[in-house]
């Protein structure tokens, strides 16, 4: 329902921009508010449609300068970069062009200190992930949902098998406490680093969506020079890495990589779903779910960012 409403509002925004600010084929002049490319019109319409949806508006005419200003501040607080904030501001001002007070105040982006990626908390908030997905196609969206829901590496999306098609590696002792605290889901097998096969749990509704993408016959693709026989029409490996990078930079202005989805999974598990276990027990469960088996590596996803570390 929300996607339909956002599409409707985006279409309305595109018509508004074409009717009032269409500068395609016209000479550019200093101070002109006209938009001179179809791509810019499409992008600003997308931004307007998302803003109106986030503000729960049924019509663009209901947008007020105060609401637009508050939304700008909200985007700043989410971590959007200065360039993207400026684009949002210009887009919303075009919707408000008939208002007497249609000039929005510039919002300054939060300062971002440049530190090595290895020292950063690479986790995305759920809101940031939803925001990133607005700039993705349906295939990339579903792949992103699966990755964060099951804590997968990008290449593991290419190895998903049903439990009657593969089994977890017998060289490891698997805890029966894995997936404790998770809601109902479907277990699958993925192959991770060094060929380790492990069970992962995908939420029931997401698994049902994924099964609609199952291929009639396995298909071989090449990712980073390695062949993968895929059973589902998903985006994985370098293709998902690249798609996630583009969407994250476009919406947030920065990117911690699709691997940050594993940080999100780990911190959600420890902070929200494994609270009935001791820290040591929770770390053991999580290490097996992530396919690491080494506590020092698992802690990299948590300390000092998790509430329990």
Predicted regions and their residues:
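Basic, Lys/Arg- and aromatic-enriched nucleic-acid-binding interface segment
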Residues: 126-158
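DNA breakage-rejoining catalytic core of tyrosine-based enzymes
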Residues: 79, 114-131, 185, 194-205, ...
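N-terminal DNA-binding module of tyrosine recombinases/phage integrases
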Residues: 1-37
């Amino acid at each position: 329902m929300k996607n339909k409403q956002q599409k409707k509002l985006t279409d309305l925004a595109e018509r508004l921009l074409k009717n009032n600010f269409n500068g395609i084929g016209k000479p550019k002049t200093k101070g002109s508010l006209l938009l001179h490319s179809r791509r810019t019109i499409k992008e600003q319409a997308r931004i307007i449609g998302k803003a109106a949806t986030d503000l729960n508006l049924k019509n663009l005419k209901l947008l007020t300068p105060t609401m637009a200003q508050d939304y700008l501040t909200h985007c700043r607080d989410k971590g959007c970069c200065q360039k993207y904030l400026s684009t949002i501001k210009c887009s919303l001002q075009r919707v408000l062009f008939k208002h007497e007070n249609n000039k929005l105040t510039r919002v300054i982006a939060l300062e971002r200190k440049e530190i090595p990626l290895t020292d950063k908390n690479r986790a995305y908030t759920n809101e940031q992930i939803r925001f990133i997905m607005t700039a993705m196609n349906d295939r990339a969206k579903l792949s992103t949902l699966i990755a964060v829901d099951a804590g997968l590496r990008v290449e593991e999306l290419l190895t998903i098998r049903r439990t009657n098609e593969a089994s977890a590696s017998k060289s490891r002792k698997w805890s029966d406490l894995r997936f404790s605290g998770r809601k109902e889901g479907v277990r699958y097998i993925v192959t991770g680093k060094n060929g380790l096969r492990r069970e992962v749990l995908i939420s029931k509704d997401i698994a049902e969506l994924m099964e609609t993408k199952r291929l009639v016959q396995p298909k071989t693709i090449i990712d980073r020079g390695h062949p993968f026989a895929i059973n589902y029409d998903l985006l994985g490996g370098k293709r998902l890495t690249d798609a996630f990078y583009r969407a994250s930079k476009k919406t947030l202005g920065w990117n911690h990589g699709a691997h940050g989805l594993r940080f999100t999974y780990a911190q959600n598990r420890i902070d929200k779903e494994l609270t009935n276990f001791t820290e040591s027990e929770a770390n053991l469960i999580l290490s097996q779910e992530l396919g690491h088996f080494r506590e020092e590596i698992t802690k990299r996803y948590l300390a000092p960012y998790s509430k329990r570390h």
